[in-house]
């Protein structure tokens, strides 16, 4: 007879700093040992910007979850870590000064990675960020991760519709079936040029459109989010990937975020699917 004991787990990518107390208590009751909060996205708190966010905004996106993480640990009894990076889902000004803050932030024991970040054709608030400019900012973050020898969480974009969000989006015309691979190729060209060790790289939001490429053409870890109702990946999908390819390099995460529907039990359900 299979054991029904709760299996501890780590949620390697989430945005739960925007969640209420009760949601944290629910997550804490599922056996979670630790979470890694990805900071840098203003939409987590349902903010609407009329002007391009600047250095003070970015500092707040990062420092608020860093401060919150210690309180959350004391209240909910599991470890809370943070990754910091400039997300291209929101255009920002003064990004050079923002990047200068990262080395000092990474000295904090609860800040463990750069990211999530990755070239994205879609920006919130209709404030388009040209791809060529994104490449420059992205490369600087990759170089920083290599220099500091810290994990790098790579965001791969998902096709989006304005109705799924709180405000107008600046959108892309790349076909859905080519979407992730097209922008992942741009990211990987820069990552390989800089020489970032793939063992320090997590390629996140992986789905069937890029799975084979990531498995065969990289040595990176493979992040699959199972907790958002907006995504097509779910506990059953993760279990299917494990059955087809084995567990090596695979990382499950919730990618919970406050502006879409979420399944707070998604990772425990994934563990059950794997039994």
Residue locations for each model-derived region?
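Short secondary-structure boundary segments
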Residues: 39-40, 226-227, 254-256
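Mid-to-C-terminal alpha-helical segments outside catalytic/metal-binding sites
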Residues: 144, 267-275
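Mid-domain alpha/beta scaffold segments of enzyme catalytic cores
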Residues: 1-174, 182-190, 198-209, 214-217, ...
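Short acidic/histidine-rich active-site segments
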Residues: 245-264
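Conserved active-site and cofactor/substrate-binding residues in soluble primary-metabolism enzymes
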Residues: 182, 236, 262-265, 269
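His/Asp/Glu-enriched short active-site or ligand-binding loop at hydrolase and phosphoryl-transfer sites
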Residues: 219-233
